[in-house]
């Protein structure tokens, strides 16, 4: 290697060959996936926070005086969301009362550790924390459920219970809005999955920045256009305290092929993530298509398009020792579909293994 | 070559749950120290540090999409990715975005 090449390699490594695209003063530390701009740490903080602020303002997510719960898992997305929302609330005088809301699924060695992280966040950010547990709400922990039914399908229970638990926790806190840390990568992934499942009801909902305005408590996704890479880099540079490990009962959940596909696309052309979200937003459902009607569960009063909500059906199965009740393909509103559509095994398996967490919009 | 390697975002679980590793990397036979790149380092890490599920870390000869790499706190996308030259005392951080939380 000649000295010229050596010098070039050094300067390339140090990023000294160019300056931050935005301030033109400092060394860049990051290549932004959505714009491909090379920017410094300080400008990164500024554009990251400002873009989220613009999303909040342009979509009118909040009104002054509202009580807002942040769904807090202790993971990177909710931790960064709690931090950034606190900052913006102060800086721009949104006038919000912010709370942390955590769900304890009762998974030993996983949720107890991540909840310790949220308890530290409560102190670090000065946000009151409410924890709601499956044990309190349903009488069953995930540990209990897995003992009964094994690893297959347990994610279905957890996803259904968690979604409802968040609403119940939000009601306890008497909040006006619930925010979650779903990011652009999560939403693009969900668009793909709902297309592949042919789930048109969810497809029309999954790109909405606010959902459930006709339900108990509206949910907002301020990170809808925020890339996961930037959330991780922000947390790293700010040294935010978060917990990351996969759920011990769904060790293969992260292998969902849609997630891997999204990451492969991002590597080739990072803008693809925003493009997929845009495609999801632009889908039009024929007005003649029958959509499930929202009503309430006869048993617990939660919103449901059936007589009983999914959580009550699953709970009845558990309590009766018949855990397979409610598991399997829904039959539609009237339950009159006889045809069992065969899916390729690998696709169905991958979809099933991803039936938890961010999928449950 | 003395390096500090850090694994985060769940990747530490692949390395005996150790987040920070101070390692002494031998240069490949006869290699000039100026020729040691991230490509060599990844190969070394896969061989010497990854104890389980290497597919969570590597895909082909590079990190799996969704794993972020910082060299001295700088995105490796700015410094040439696999061709980034690594020097003595460098700090290399790997963070996964694939694990849930």
UniProtKB/Swiss-Prot annotation, chain B:
Phylogenetic lineage: Eukaryota, Viridiplantae, Streptophyta, Embryophyta, Tracheophyta
Cross-link (Glycyl lysine isopeptide (Gly-Lys) (interchain with K-? in acceptor proteins)): 101
Family designation: Belongs to the URM1 family.
Residue numbers of 1-thioglycine PTMs: 101
Family annotation (InterPro entries): Beta-grasp_dom_sf, Mopterin_synth/thiamin_S_b, Urm1
Protein name: Ubiquitin-related modifier 1 homolog 1
Subcellular localization(s) per the UniProt record: Cytoplasm
Organism from which the protein derives: Arabidopsis thaliana (Mouse-ear cress)
Pfam family, one: Urm1
Keywords: Cytoplasm, Isopeptide bond, tRNA processing, Ubl conjugation pathway
Modification comment: C-terminal thiocarboxylation occurs in 2 steps, it is first acyl-adenylated (-COAMP) via the hesA/moeB/thiF part of the MOCS3 homolog, then thiocarboxylated (-COSH) via the rhodanese domain of the MOCS3 homolog.
PANTHER family: RURM1 PROTEIN
Signal peptide annotation: none
Function as written in the Swiss-Prot or TrEMBL entry: Acts as a sulfur carrier required for 2-thiolation of mcm(5)S(2)U at tRNA wobble positions of cytosolic tRNA(Lys), tRNA(Glu) and tRNA(Gln). Serves as sulfur donor in tRNA 2-thiolation reaction by being thiocarboxylated (-COSH) at its C-terminus by MOCS3. The sulfur is then transferred to tRNA to form 2-thiolation of mcm(5)S(2)U. Also acts as a ubiquitin-like protein (UBL) that is covalently conjugated via an isopeptide bond to lysine residues of target proteins.
Record GO biological process: protein urmylation; tRNA thio-modification; tRNA wobble uridine modification
Any single GO CC term annotated in Swiss-Prot or TrEMBL for this entry: cytosol
Biological pathway: tRNA modification; 5-methoxycarbonylmethyl-2-thiouridine-tRNA biosynthesis
